[in-house]
């Protein structure tokens, strides 16, 4: 049995077409079912639903053999012991710095001001600003990032940006793009040795599905 760890939401929705192309159908709709372990039309493959931030942990410690996770989560939480064979090119977005309209971010950086930055990406933010030589105080938040500059909690935020519509709706502007993000396939190293044939077959199926999806774009 191969266990594939997925998270609900955009990654799950975006992976479904790739699964179908690979000949895999998930038998339950996670939006309608309370099940956390879902069967598939492949008797030797099941799906477990976990929080996005927990996918690397499940794969690393053997709760799942293989998983799909955003590059942001891998960079933030660490990916020790994980084999990363494939960028699936799904759930694309970016991590960016944003500030409230009217805040002169460029001037603050040039003057060497110490900025308060709210984010859930503390490690990524720390590395980014350190590389630029910008002095920051990082404030860890878990949601509603856009509120931080509007309430005076922070001068800037570092967060995922897709279309930018949420920033615009809250009178924030994107001032720096830190990196582009997409979802990657991750594999437990021990599982790869013990279940090499079925896991390699699954990786190859995903690779072919990605190539076919790219050809249609």
Swiss-Prot record:
This protein's record includes keyword Amino-acid biosynthesis: yes
Keywords from the UniProt entry: Amino-acid biosynthesis, ATP-binding, Cytoplasm, Glycosyltransferase, Histidine biosynthesis, Nucleotide-binding, Transferase
EC number: 2.4.2.17
Localization annotation: Cytoplasm
Broad enzyme group: transferase
GO cellular component, one term: cytoplasm
Record-level GO BP terms: L-histidine biosynthetic process
Pfam families: HisG (PF01634)
Pathway: Amino-acid biosynthesis; L-histidine biosynthesis; L-histidine from 5-phospho-alpha-D-ribose 1-diphosphate: step 1/9
UniProt similarity note: Belongs to the ATP phosphoribosyltransferase family. Short subfamily.
Subunit and interaction comment: Heteromultimer composed of HisG and HisZ subunits.
Domain statement: Lacks the C-terminal regulatory region which is replaced by HisZ.
Protein name, entry field: ATP phosphoribosyltransferase
Source species of the chain: Polaromonas naphthalenivorans (strain CJ2)
Gene this protein is translated from: hisG
């Amino acid at each position: 049995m191969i266990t594939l760890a997925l998270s609900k939401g955009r990654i799950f929705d975006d992976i479904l077409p790739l699964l179908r192309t690979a000949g895999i159908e998930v038998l339950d709709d996670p939006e309608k079912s309370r099940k956390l372990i879902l069967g598939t039309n492949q008797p030797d493959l099941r799906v477990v639903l976990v929080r996005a931030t927990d996918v690397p942990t499940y794969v690393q410690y053997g709760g799942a053999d293989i998983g799909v996770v955003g590059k942001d989560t891998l960079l933030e939480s660490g990916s020790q012991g994980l084999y990363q064979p494939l960028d699936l090119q799904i759930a694309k977005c970016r991590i960016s710095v944003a500030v409230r309209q009217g805040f002169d971010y460029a001037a603050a950086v040039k003057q060497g001001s110490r900025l308060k930055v709210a984010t859930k990406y503390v490690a990524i933010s720390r590395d980014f600003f350190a590389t630029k030589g910008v002095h920051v105080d990082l404030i860890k938040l878990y949601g509603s990032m856009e509120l931080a500059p509007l309430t005076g909690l922070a001068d800037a935020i570092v967060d995922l940006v897709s279309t930018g519509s949420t920033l615009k709706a809250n009178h924030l502007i994107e001032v720096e793009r830190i990196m582009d993000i997409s979802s990657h396939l991750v594999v437990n190293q021990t599982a790869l040795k013990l279940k090499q044939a079925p896991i390699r077959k699954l990786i190859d199926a995903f690779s072919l599905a990605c190539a076919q999806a790219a050809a249609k774009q």
